[in-house]
Amino acid sequence: MTKLSGSDSKSTLYCSFCGKSQHEVRKLIAGPTVFICDECVELCNDIIREETRGALHKGDGSVPTPQEICTILDQYVIGQSKAKRVLSVAVHNHYKRLNHGGKDADVELAKSNILLIGPTGCGKTLLAETLARTFDVPFTMADATTLTEAGYVGEDVENIILKLLQASDYNVERAQRGIVYIDEIDKITRKSDNPSITRDVSGEGVQQALLKLMEGTTASVPPQGGRKHPQQEFLQVDTTNILFICGGAFAGLDRIIADRLEGKSIGFGAHVAAPDERRTGEILQECEPEDLLKFGLIPEFVGRLPVLATLEDLDQSALVRILTEPKNALVKQYQKLFELEDAKLEFTEDALAAIAKKGIERKTGARGLRSILEGILLDTMFELPSLEGVSEIIVDKDVAEGKKEPVRVFAQKEKDASPGAA
């Protein structure tokens, strides 16, 4: 609406919602015959945010079944069927507990955090990331190697919850239903068998600091980081319903397990397979809590990770499948890159097998496959944007083994396969 302000010939504009004039507010936004001020816009945003928070708990209460969760994991992670089953059941029960826990006051359902143990590059982190996508909940990854006790140089454990808050756009209620993945958890083990020798601020001290956070407590989280802004107001976050997944390679744990199994198998006719005869993943399947204690985790910490999932080594056939089958498979990624240059990228079966064999020799699991592909395709990716008429790039076994350059097929004479530059 428009009014004249006294003797002033110019008209003064007013907000159609609160009635304030354009001189009383910072901004007045015009619409067809109406106006709204910046204060009313902010108020509307607050109302919408409050309704969204309330809607978090008003869904139909349905949770994907373990089989549905496992099927989704299969689309992104190859192999590891046992670990997928363990994770699917644990996560299904966790979110079922959140949706139905308050309906029966007689029985209180406890939280089951998860410990993932497996060799490097076998899919621990990818499993956790895929789970977070499946449930559309806030997800954050933390690196245990950067954590220290409060008061020492390094990150406090509360920073993990701060990252989760940032992932949920500082929506506290949404963050309280999120998933936290703590990687490299094996790097915070006790540095000495004698706990009283010296203060272990990045090992046992971090385990103790994580205890209450993982079990469930109200954490005071500084929105801007606690050490640089000590005067700020703290946000209160209840960690009771946050699912913690810890993962680590636990190098050397297989030897501890093998020693324990060897001690049990004593007597006439007892056959014990030498550690060299069994792969690391096979030995880790036999892991017991006592092995984790001997490795350096404190009993209280092991007790707060009741669900144990061990992952297997990836063999050559699994690595070949990883290269081609998942939705975001490496071969599909590089084929997309070459499509952007109007060229088709093809790998022969022998080439994929040779690449997988190289990955096993490097002992870096699936993580090392990208660097192998980069090495094979680097020169081609460097030269291709400057070349004209290349319609196809073919990688065969000799190319994968470094014996020759990828084969380039030119559009004007597709019958002639030209190795190297034209």
Swiss-Prot record:
ATP binds at residues 119-126. GO terms for biological process: cell division; proteolysis involved in protein catabolic process. Residues 3-56 form the ClpX-type ZB domain. Gene3D superfamilies: 1.10.8.60, ClpX chaperone, C4-type zinc finger domain, P-loop containing nucleotide triphosphate hydrolases. Zn(2+) binds at residues 15, 18, 37, 40. InterPro entries: AAA+_ATPase, ATP-dep_Clp_protease_ClpX, ATPase_AAA_core, Clp_ATPase_C, Clp_protease_ATP-bd_su_ClpX, ClpX_bact, P-loop_NTPase, Znf_CppX_C4. Keywords: ATP-binding, Chaperone, Metal-binding, Nucleotide-binding, Zinc. One of its GO terms (cellular component) is HslUV protease complex. Pfam families: AAA_2, ClpB_D2-small, zf-C4_ClpX. Signal peptide: none annotated. One of its GO terms (molecular function) is protein dimerization activity. Component of the ClpX-ClpP complex. Forms a hexameric ring that, in the presence of ATP, binds to fourteen ClpP subunits assembled into a disk-like structure with a central cavity, resembling the structure of eukaryotic proteasomes. Belongs to the ClpX chaperone family. ATP-dependent specificity component of the Clp protease. It directs the protease to specific substrates. Can perform chaperone functions in the absence of ClpP. HAMAP family: ClpX. This is ATP-dependent Clp protease ATP-binding subunit ClpX. The gene is clpX.
